């Protein structure tokens, strides 16, 4: 019997319209009610994923930022691996100079982008990052 179920969000758990289907919501609720542990494993920001989890009303671990952060079911930070400041500055400088690259930088509870693209808001149907 499975004890843990983990899933990505984009292209996996979320439908093509970037929303959780009623079936997905019900399945996640049933999994956690049966005592299985659910883990969100995604490249998204932890606040974004936390809103999705809270809207579902379930207890779930979160592995976010492509594995750079891990939060427990209460949202407490268990693990963080941040880029060295000099490396991050170098990467951001290279990417910032190219108009075709959009850079997303997460720092604790903050999210920075080098350019705002309104069309990217379609990815945030289940949670709104302020």
State what each model feature region is.
Residues 28-51, 66, 104-107:
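Substrate-recognition element of Asp-dependent hydrolases with the DxDx(T/V) motif
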Residues 51-58, 116-120:
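Glycine-rich loop at the start of a catalytic domain that most often binds anionic cofactors/ligands
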Residues 21-23, 84-85:
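Charged helix-capping and loop-helix junction motifs
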Residues 23-35, 90, 94:
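Catalytic-core regions built around general acid/base machinery
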Residues 2-17, 91:
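Asp-based phosphoryl-transfer active-site loop
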Residues 68-130:
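HAD-like small-molecule phosphatases
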């Amino acid at each position: 019997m499975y004890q843990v179920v983990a899933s990505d969000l984009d292209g996996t758990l979320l439908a093509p319209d970037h929303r959780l289907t009623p079936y997905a919501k019900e399945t996640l609720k049933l999994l956690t009610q049966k005592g299985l542990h659910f883990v969100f494993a995604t490249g998204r920001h932890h606040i974004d994923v936390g809103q999705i989890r809270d809207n579902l009303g379930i207890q779930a671990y979160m592995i976010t930022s492509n594995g750079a952060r891990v939060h427990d079911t209460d949202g407490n930070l268990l693990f963080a691996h941040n880029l060295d400041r000099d490396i991050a500055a170098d990467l951001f400088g290279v990417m910032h100079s190219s108009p075709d690259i959009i850079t997303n930088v997460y720092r604790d509870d903050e999210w920075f982008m080098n350019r705002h693209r309104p069309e990217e808001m379609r990815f945030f149907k289940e949670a709104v990052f302020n």
